[in-house]
UniProtKB/Swiss-Prot annotation:
Entry's family note: Belongs to the class-III pyridoxal-phosphate-dependent aminotransferase family. HemL subfamily.
EC number of this enzyme: 5.4.3.8
One Gene Ontology term from the biological process aspect of the record: protoporphyrinogen IX biosynthetic process
Annotated protein name in UniProt: Glutamate-1-semialdehyde 2,1-aminomutase
Keywords, alphabetical: Cytoplasm, Isomerase, Porphyrin biosynthesis, Pyridoxal phosphate
Primary subcellular site in the record, as a coarse category: cytoplasm
Co-factor(s): pyridoxal 5'-phosphate
MF term (GO), any: pyridoxal phosphate binding
Annotated metabolic or biological route of this protein: Porphyrin-containing compound metabolism; protoporphyrin-IX biosynthesis; 5-aminolevulinate from L-glutamyl-tRNA(Glu): step 2/2
Organism of this sequence: Desulfatibacillum aliphaticivorans
Any single Gene Ontology cellular-component annotation: cytoplasm
C-alpha cells in the first residue's frame, strides 16, 4: 500500500478529497483507497502490484470482467476510425436496436453519457409530457447527482451520512417527495393528496444504493397501478439493474412495464454511457422531434457504442445468466454459512449477480433497516477482506457485483477469506 498512500497524498493536493467520486476515498471504512494500476478478468492489481479478486467491477458495468477480449477488440476497431465526430454513426443505431430488442418496455432510446444524465433527462421528459412538476422517489434510492433527486439518497450520500447536499435550492427540493421504499400504502396516501400534481415516480426496481434490497411484489406492481390511476409517468431506474439482474433487466424479472427506463453501466461495456428509453409516444417529445430539449457533445460516441454492442452480444449468449446465477448463488450461500459458523449476525441480500452482506439481525427491506446495520463491524470486515486480497465496495450501502469472469476458484478463495475474517470480528 505504500505506493497507493503516496498517490493518495499527491491526489489530495489537486483533486477534492483525493478522488473523483466520494465513496472511493474509503473514509467510511477507516482506511485509505487502493490506487489501481490494471485489471484482467476477475482480478485487479493495485499500484504496489498486489492482486485482488474484484467485486466492485467499476460499480457494475463490468459484467464480463476486466478487459474482455471481445470488448477490447470492439473498442480498438472503433478507435481506429476516430474517437468522436459530433455527427451520427451507424454504431448508435446498432446499439439502439439491440436495446430495443432486449428491453421489454423500450420502443425508442436516446443515448447520453452517464446514469445521472439519463435520470435528469427522463425527469425533464416526464415533466414536459405531463405539465406537472412533482416527483416521487424513495428513501435510500440513488438516481445520480441531479439536484431534484439528491433528497434522502443512497450510495455515496448514504455512505457520508448526509440527508442531501448543500447547493440544492429549497424550491428544487420541495418538488421532490421521498417515501419509504417497499411501502405501497405510503405511495397511495401521498397520491390521494398530490397525485394530480405528480409528473413521475422514479424507483430503483431493485435498490442497489442502500445495499441490495429486493422489492416486494405488491410494491413494484402497485407502483404501476398507482401511476395508471393518476396519469403519472413511471420511471424504472435500471442504470444498475439493466442487463445485470436479467438480460431484460428487473422489469423482465418482476413483470412490470414502466413508461420510461433509465440505463447505463453494462450498456457501455466499461466506458462512460447512459441511456433513457420507453414508449414511443413519450420519446417522440424529445428534441428535435419534440419540444423537450436534451443534448450532449459526446452522446453516442463510437467507442462506448462499440463496447456496448460487444457486451450485449456476449451476455445474450445461451446459458450466460444461468452460469452467472450459479456463481452468485454459491457466493451468497457460502457467505451465509460463514457468518453463521462464526456466530456473526448477518443477512445476505441478493438479486441475480448483485448482493450485499448486511451486518444486521433481521431482514433489510428499506433504508431505515439498512441504516441500523453495524457499520463498525462492516468496516472491520472490509479491511480484513482487503488484506486477504478481496476487493469489496468500501461501504455497507453498496452492492457487490459478480461477473462472468469469476471462477469457482475465485469464489472458493473469497469464501475462505470471509470465513477467516468473520471469525476475527
Amino acid at each position: 500500500m505504500e505506493k497507493s498512500k503516496e498517490l493518495f497524498a499527491r491526489a489530495c493536493k489537486t483533486i477534492p478529497g483525493g478522488v473523483n467520486s466520494p465513496v472511493r476515498a474509503c473514509g467510511s471504512v477507516g482506511t485509505d483507497p487502493c490506487f489501481i494500476a490494471r485489471g484482467q478478468g476477475s482480478a485487479i492489481f493495485d499500484a504496489d502490484g498486489k492482486q485482488y479478486i474484484d467485486y466492485i467491477g467499476s460499480w457494475g458495468p463490468l459484467i464480463l470482467g476486466h478487459r474482455h477480449p471481445a470488448v477490447i477488440k470492439a473498442i480498438e476497431a472503433a478507435l481506429a476510425n476516430g474517437c468522436t465526430f459530433g455527427a451520427p454513426t451507424e454504431l448508435e443505431i446498432d446499439l439502439a436496436e439491440a436495446v430495443v430488442n432486449i428491453m421489454p418496455s423500450v420502443e425508442m432510446v436516446r443515448m447520453v453519457n452517464s446514469g445521472t444524465e439519463a435520470t435528469m433527462s427522463a425527469i425533464r421528459l416526464a415533466r414536459g409530457a405531463t405539465g406537472r412538476d412533482g416527483i416521487v422517489k424513495f428513501d435510500g434510492c440513488y438516481h445520480g447527482h441531479g439536484d431534484s433527486l439528491l433528497v434522502a439518497a443512497g450510495s455515496g450520500v448514504a455512505t457520508l451520512g448526509i440527508p442531501g447536499s448543500p447547493g440544492v435550492p429549497d424550491k428544487v427540493a420541495e418538488s421532490t417527495a421521498s417515501l419509504e421504499y417497499n411501502n405501497i400504502e405510503a405511495v397511495k396516501e401521498y397520491c390521494k393528496k398530490k397525485g394530480d400534481r405528480t409528473a413521475a415516480i422514479i424507483v430503483e426496481p431493485v435498490a442497489g444504493n442502500m445495499g441490495v434490497v429486493a422489492p416486494k411484489p405488491e410494491f413494484i406492481q402497485g407502483l404501476r397501478e398507482v401511476c395508471d390511476q393518476y396519469g403519472i409517468v413511471l420511471i424504472l431506474d435500471e442504470v444498475m439493474t439493466g442487463f445485470r439482474v436479467a438480460l431484460g433487466g428487473a422489469q423482465s424479472l418482476y413483470g412490470v412495464t414502466p413508461d420510461l427506463t433509465t440505463m447505463g453501466k453494462v450498456i457501455g461495456g466499461g466506458l462512460p454511457v447512459g441511456a433513457y428509453g420507453g414508449k414511443r409516444s413519450l420519446m417522440e417529445k424529445i428534441a428535435p422531434s419534440g419540444p423537450v430539449y436534451q443534448a450532449g457533445t459526446l452522446s453516442g460516441n463510437p467507442m462506448a457504442m462499440a463496447a456496448g454492442i460487444a457486451t450485449l452480444k456476449e451476455i445474450s449468449a445461451p446459458g450466460f445468466y444461468e452460469a452467472l446465477e450459479k456463481s452468485s448463488q454459491t457466493l451468497a450461500d457460502g457467505l451465509k454459512k460463514a457468518a453463521a459458523d462464526a456466530g456473526v449476525e448477518a443477512v445476505i441480500s441478493r438479486v441475480g449477480s448483485m448482493q450485499t452482506l448486511f451486518f444486521s439481525a433481521g431482514p433489510v427491506e428499506n433504508f431505515e433497516d439498512a441504516k441500523k446495520c453495524d457499520l463498525d463491524r462492516f468496516s472491520k470486515f472490509y479491511q480484513g477482506m482487503r488484506a486477504e486480497g478481496v476487493f469489496l465496495p468500501p461501504s455497507q450501502f453498496e452492492a457487490w457485483f459478480v461477473s462472468s469472469a469469476h471462477t469457482e476458484a475465485d469464489i472458493e478463495a473469497t469464501l475462505k477469506a470471509a470465513e477467516k475474517v468473520l471469525r476475527q470480528l
